[in-house]
Amino acid sequence: MPELPEVEVTRLSFAFEIAGARVISVRIGKPLRWPLGCSPTQLAGRSVQAVRRRGKYLLIDLDQGLLLVHLGMSGSLSFARQLPPAGAHDHFEMTTTLGTLRLTDPRRFGAVVYAKGEDAPEAHKLLGKLGMEPLSDDFDVDRFHDELKRRRAAIKQVLLAGDTVVGVGNIYASEALFMAGIRPTLSAARLSRPRSARLHAAIRDVLARAVATGGSTLRDFSSAKGENGHFQLEAMVYARQGQPCRVCATPIKSLRQGQRSTFYCPHCQKA
């Protein structure tokens, strides 16, 4: 699943080019996770003001309302002046005066949802319960620690839930916990203030480096320009079960948490 870095990389790869474009037409393919919420013809004539991100959602601001885009498990966006003919997995296509934006999603867990502009976007039901943005000033270390002290679940599970800090998916949760020296199964409530601060810094660092390297391409992720990410090449623990830790040479181990694979170093993450 594309996580925060992949969504941010996607945003950066087309936000500037599409700003100011006028929508000519919208084509809908097979049903996605949620319906569009309006007739495609209603979007014709709207102009694109900006493209923002909230967690793993892209927010395409229009002069009237906005489009919420979620890439689901396997989705990706493409944007170009001219794209090849739509294929079997291309389920949303918005043609504009500056190019065509297309959502390709083989598993169809992604979605494009229109939201009217009467209310603040943050109030939308898909966004209202999201946690702090880890790459913004909103991600306050004291608030982060206070939130963790109220959670008895394993720290890895708390990070994945998205209601404390948003967008830290499976890859980057494992990496951040390694950097902070915290065992993934430790109860979040047991983290001291200094350890919460180390995790806070590790989350910001890992996500920033992932964005800078284009995200992680494990299977089919690419930016809206078709470029693959490279963060997976420098991962410290993720998908490295049995390989030596890059710090201490102890073999990396894995375990299952909530039906997701977690990777960690038993020496560097003793507690």
Swiss-Prot record:
Coiled coil: none
Disulfide bonds: none
GO BP term, example: base-excision repair
Cofactor note: Binds 1 zinc ion per subunit.
Catalysed reactions, as listed in the record: Hydrolysis of DNA containing ring-opened 7-methylguanine residues, releasing 2,6-diamino-4-hydroxy-5-(N-methyl)formamidopyrimidine; 2'-deoxyribonucleotide-(2'-deoxyribose 5'-phosphate)-2'-deoxyribonucleotide-DNA = a 3'-end 2'-deoxyribonucleotide-(2,3-dehydro-2,3-deoxyribose 5'-phosphate)-DNA + a 5'-end 5'-phospho-2'-deoxyribonucleoside-DNA + H(+)
Positions of transmembrane segments: none
Active site residues of this protein: 2 (schiff-base intermediate with dna), 3 (proton donor), 56 (proton donor), 260 (proton donor)
Name by which UniProt lists this protein: Formamidopyrimidine-DNA glycosylase
Organism: Albidiferax ferrireducens (strain ATCC BAA-621 / DSM 15236 / T118)
Highest classification ranks of the organism: Bacteria, Pseudomonadati, Pseudomonadota, Betaproteobacteria, Burkholderiales
